Swiss-Prot record:
Part of the 50S ribosomal subunit. It comes from the Eukaryota. Belongs to the universal ribosomal protein uL16 family. The keyword Repeat does not apply. The lineage of its organism: Eukaryota, Viridiplantae, Streptophyta, Embryophyta, Tracheophyta. Keywords: Chloroplast, Plastid, Ribonucleoprotein, Ribosomal protein. This is Large ribosomal subunit protein uL16c. GO terms for molecular function: rRNA binding; structural constituent of ribosome. The gene is rpl16.
Amino acid sequence: MNYNPKRTRFRKQHRGRMKGISYRGNTICFGKYALQALEPAWITSRQIEAGRRAMTRNARRGGKIWVRIFPDKPVTVRPAETRMGSGKGSPEYWVAVVKPGRILYEMGGVTENIARRAISIAASKMPIRAQFIISG
């Protein structure tokens, strides 16, 4: 899966700041088990995909996985050994802005110990601390 928007209104964005906690996307909606972020961070599309792959490999054919975050923020990088000035760099990769409390992945249709194992492996792929939660 290639996670990036099909088209955006603008090619480049400001960095912004990650203040406070997540008020949207912080409840379990689809599955029974979930991975919840405990720290603010930018999570790249590659990290999201690595976590998803780890979960699917661990759950094998049972269960369903939902990815609740989408990388819609372009991160620009300047070429190496370039002098200051001459505009902003070109978009290099995409990130999802994640605040504490945000649900990253959800899982359903499997037993709790399988879900716990799969989600803990996905959590180790993330650049932040995250916790396993159960709905209800």
